[in-house]
């Protein structure tokens, strides 16, 4: 029988992708060279510096997700005008400081107040060799946020600790925004550290950032979780920021119009939208359900019944996860409105691909626009949700 410490370690390795599963084999060194390396450097991690996560983070975040605790969010907006060259950095600092109205805080704890001090900071960056109109990305813009009613001071303290640990050898500034429902902080991090190594965060690095951010939040008394969508049986991505902001202003993005047209065509032809990633999702679901079963069984054996029950609850949540695409959900909503029948979630089987046809009623444009399509095929310049 595994010891509790061994189970924690194996769960940590699995949730981060180091091993194929609890008690599974290692993925090998090539995996970590691909997912954690500074560009042009043989050492360090692509996601910056920072110490190791606390042992047991895997189980802690899974049980937190089972309790429905809020998920931490980290986003990296992809805007060349806010990151390329000194001009891009200046644009971003103007934006996050609200043109100098909000104080920035640097990696040494110094406050940078007003446009004049921001300009002094930019002069320092220029002396580091950052060109005004460089085509290269010279700063990484990171947004860390939490749900409404999160204590803003504790959030800010957690972000500060996260930045100090994750970007230990980089110059950075941070600022908090409280003008939206979701309190959030902006980080502007220089890509090169003091040794000349360049940040090159990969997907697994970004997830590790979320885990570290959650760790810092808990240290400051904010209960939260950091899991992937698949860990919770969630398969639809959140609406991208740019289309959401356009919609909130009463406009329609090209993403919305494109998918409204695709929905109209599907409704007119009575053709249920396909799910191109269904087989991949089913395979992922099977792996996660299997791992949750192993973890729950080991916890029961070790006498941790409460934690085992939480993992079992999470397992059922994944088993019952709705694998429909955003387009399929919109199609079902439109049919419900046309036929006056309740929308039903499709089970996790091939039935999603071969839904039986019903009497087609020609839809109106209003029907399509009421569906709230938010799926985007092309995420370029829309930012990354992790």
Model regions and ranges:
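N-terminal nicking endonuclease/strand-transfer module with a His-rich metal-binding environment
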Residues: 1-386
């Amino acid at each position: 029988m595994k010891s509790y410490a061994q189970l924690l370690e194996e769960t940590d390795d699995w949730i981060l992708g180091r091993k194929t599963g609890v008690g599974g084999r290692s993925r090998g060194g090539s995996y970590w060279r691909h997912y954690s390396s500074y560009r042009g450097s043989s050492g360090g991690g692509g996601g910056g510096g920072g110490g190791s996560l606390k042992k047991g983070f895997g189980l802690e975040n899974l049980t937190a997700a089972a309790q429905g605790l809020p998920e931490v969010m980290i986003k990296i907006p992809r805007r060349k005008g806010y990151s390329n060259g000194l001009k891009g950095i200046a644009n971003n600092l103007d934006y996050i400081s609200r043109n100098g109205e909000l104080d920035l805080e640097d990696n040494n704890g110094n406050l940078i107040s007003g446009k004049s001090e921001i300009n002094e900071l930019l002069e320092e960056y220029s002396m580091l060799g950052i060109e005004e109109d460089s085509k290269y990305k010279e700063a990484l813009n990171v947004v860390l946020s939490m749900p409404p009613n999160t204590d803003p001071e504790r959030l800010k303290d957690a972000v500060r600790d996260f930045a100090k640990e994750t970007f230990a050898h980089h110059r950075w500034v941070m600022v908090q925004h409280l003008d939206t429902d979701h309190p959030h902080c902006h980080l502007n991090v220089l890509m090169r550290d003091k040794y000349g190594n360049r940040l090159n965060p990969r997907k697994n690095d970004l997830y590790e950032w979320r885990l570290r951010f959650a760790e810092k939040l808990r240290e400051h008394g904010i209960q939260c979780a950091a899991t992937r969508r698949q860990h919770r049986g969630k398969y639809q991505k959140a609406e991208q920021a740019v289309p959401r902001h356009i919609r909130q202003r009463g406009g329609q993005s090209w993403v919305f119009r494109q998918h409204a047209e695709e929905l109209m065509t599907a409704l007119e032809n009575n053709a249920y939208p396909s799910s191109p990633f269904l087989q991949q999702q089913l395979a992922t679901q099977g792996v996660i359900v299997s791992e949750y079963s192993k973890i729950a069984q080991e916890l029961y054996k070790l006498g941790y019944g409460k934690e085992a029950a939480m993992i079992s609850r999470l397992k059922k949540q994944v088993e019952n996860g709705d694998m429909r695409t955003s387009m399929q959900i919109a199609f079902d909503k439109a049919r419900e409105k046309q036929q006056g029948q309740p929308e039903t979630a499709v089970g996790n089987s091939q039935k999603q691909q071969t839904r039986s046809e019903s009497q087609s009623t020609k839809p109106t444009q209003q029907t399509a626009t009421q569906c709230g399509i938010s799926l985007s095929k092309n995420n370029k310049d829309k930012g990354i949700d992790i």
